[in-house]
């Protein structure tokens, strides 16, 4: 199965998509039943989903951003991290809360692990360095990852955090949102499923008015259906 960081190459409009997975954003099916790119951008495979992310809206690293990234390579003193950008990020062992010696990095973070980190510097060619040395920054254990368009992140967060707090409350989940479009969700599977559905709805309808109320109604309806189903099982 492909993972984030396994496939990331530049594609043009009309280029055939020749990887396996569930086609999602930026991909269309031609008359020959093959899949093609809609945009000039990067082909990305995250778990079982295939997306083409246009360069015009792809995440560009900025100093101070908090992002979720996946470790893709472990060196003697640094980790290379995929942050859902055309540019990889680096994390040095001195910028973590752990005391370790060079060459011992895999004990703390190995390839495939996810982290919630802060971008502490970005150079002129967009290479960025991360830190885990602030409260709340950490290795992410368990949970489920959702990838959305980075430009939709403010809509998922909502004014004053209102949207994401409402989703967390109605789904009994914990949610961490990276400004690069990766979102970590943990909790009971029913709640996680509901939260993912809500986030996908927000991404899809981000340009519309009255979205918070519709998402709240959507989640309450889902919750009611699940509660009713559980009650029916208990009565049988």
UniProtKB/Swiss-Prot annotation:
The lineage of its organism: Archaea, Methanobacteriati, Thermoplasmatota, Thermoplasmata, Thermoplasmatales. The keyword RNA-binding applies. It comes from the Archaea. Residues 64-133 form the S1 motif domain. InterPro entries: Exosome_RNA_bind1/RRP40/RRP4, KH_dom, KH_dom_type_1, KH_dom_type_1_sf, NA-bd_OB-fold, Rrp4, RRP4_S1, S1_domain. NCBIfam families: PRK04163.1-1. This is Exosome complex component Rrp4. Residues 141-199 form the KH domain. It is found in: Cytoplasm. HAMAP family: Exosome_Rrp4. Belongs to the RRP4 family. Gene3D superfamilies: 2.40.50.100, K Homology domain, type 1, Nucleic acid-binding proteins. Non-catalytic component of the exosome, which is a complex involved in RNA degradation. Increases the RNA binding and the efficiency of RNA degradation. Confers strong poly(A) specificity to the exosome. Component of the archaeal exosome complex. Forms a trimer of Rrp4 and/or Csl4 subunits. The trimer associates with a hexameric ring-like arrangement composed of 3 Rrp41-Rrp42 heterodimers. One of its GO terms (biological process) is CUT catabolic process. Signal peptide: none annotated. Keywords: Cytoplasm, Exosome, RNA-binding. CDD domains: KH-I_Rrp4_prokar, S1_Rrp4.
């Amino acid at each position: 199965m492909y993972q984030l960081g396994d496939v990331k190459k530049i594609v043009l409009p009309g280029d055939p998509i020749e990887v396996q997975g569930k086609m999602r954003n930026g991909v269309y099916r031609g008359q020959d039943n093959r899949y093609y790119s809609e945009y000039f951008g990067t082909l990305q495979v995250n778990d079982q989903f295939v997306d083409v992310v246009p360069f015009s809206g792809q995440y560009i690293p900025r100093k101070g951003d908090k992002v979720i990234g996946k470790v893709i390579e472990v060196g003697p003193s640094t980790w290379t991290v995929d942050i859902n950008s055309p540019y990889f990020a680096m994390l040095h062992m001195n910028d973590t809360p752990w005391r370790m010696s060079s060459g011992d990095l895999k004990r703390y973070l190995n390839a495939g692990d996810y982290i919630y980190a802060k971008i502490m510097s970005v150079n002129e060619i967009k290479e960025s360095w991360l830190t885990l040395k602030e409260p709340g920054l950490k290795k992410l254990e368990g949970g489920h990852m959702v990838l959305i368009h980075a430009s939709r992140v403010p809509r998922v967060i909502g004014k004053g955090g209102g949207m994401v707090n409402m989703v967390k409350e109605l789904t009994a989940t914990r949610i961490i949102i990276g400004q690069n479009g990766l979102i970590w969700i943990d909790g009971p599977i029913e709640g996680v499923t509901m939260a993912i559905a809500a986030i996908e709805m927000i991404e899809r309808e981000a340009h519309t008015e009255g979205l918070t109320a519709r998402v709240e109604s959507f989640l309450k309806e889902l919750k009611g259906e699940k509660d009713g189903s559980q009650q029916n099982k208990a009565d049988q």
